[in-house]
């Protein structure tokens, strides 16, 4: 409890220092965004474009973290907001679903299943896999764990990472079959670097959220950037924010 209070006080001091820098009418504040690795979302990109056009003197920094670290940064008020996966909701934070993605299984060019058609889940049985550190029954990628289990791939995970780019690297290197968001992997599929494996329907849905701390005193740049995102979330149907 004492530690949480100390983190809260430290965050408040950090926020006060940031707010005191804003003494002009023009928005010049800094926005620090914590994102999970490889967030591919046109809605987010459009919000960034519009924000910069409106406030060219405001600055941005985007830190790539695990989803857990991103949420911790928001809790500690050291990040303006986060874009990440959510396992359990903290009642002290606010959450809005930014987009939905679907995960599929992929292999690289040197894998024996690469390039083969008419495959079924049974063809994946016994093959080793690589995955994310959160690909566990008790964690945020539980649906992906169940997808691997349905293919009878077992628990033989020979490589893990918390970053999508490194999971992708291991898949392309032929270390094992691995999960990736379908819309993120499509470019590599088109380039002949990845091969999409079964299942091809009923793939696991994963929601990516915007997370912020309502107790944090945001500067005007942070407020504006958050409003850019919220406005799009409220007006664009989830069907148009679903990728895969």
Residue ranges of each PLM-predicted region?
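Alpha-helical "hinge/linker" immediately C-terminal to small N-terminal DNA-binding modules
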Residues: 1-22, 231-234
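Short amphipathic alpha-helical coupling segments at ligand-binding clamshell hinges
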Residues: 1-5, 43, 47, 120, ...
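Flexible hinge/capping segments at coil-to-helix
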Residues: 24, 93-132
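Central regulatory/effector-binding core of bacterial HTH transcription factors
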Residues: 28-91, 244
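A late-sequence structural motif
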Residues: 43, 195-239, 243-244
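A local structural motif
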Residues: 54-62, 148-158, 193
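Beta-alpha-beta core module
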Residues: 90-97, 101, 166-215
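Secondary-structure junction motif
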Residues: 121, 127-152, 218-220, 226, ...
